[in-house]
């Protein structure tokens, strides 16, 4: 039998078992947690919808993924918006709706400052991505120094 590519084979029973094991481990170890599923990894609507039913948030990195998350039933407050190429309208929409946004770069800090000034009573849910030279801080303990 010939299949078109890409071709995904998903064992629903194993996926359910693994997902429940992850949730159980997080409940035991962390208590207060949320799982975000990366649309970039595999945005197959069946898979995303299956995981949404288990309570995951949508983790998106583009306007297309953001739109897909909405089309699959994720509210803005169930979206984590990552990545360095966000557009300002979706940046503001996610934050104003109570979603989580991880900021990348000075431009987004400027947008955040302007948005906060325009909505002084609103609380925003943000993360800040920080990059640093891990090999310099931990010499010989990373793969960065390997040829």
Walk through the language-model features, giving the residues of each.
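A charged N-terminal "starter" segment
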Residues: 1-117, 121-125
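Active-site loop/helix belt of alpha/beta enzymes
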Residues: 115, 132-147
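ATP-grasp fold ATP-binding core
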Residues: 125-131
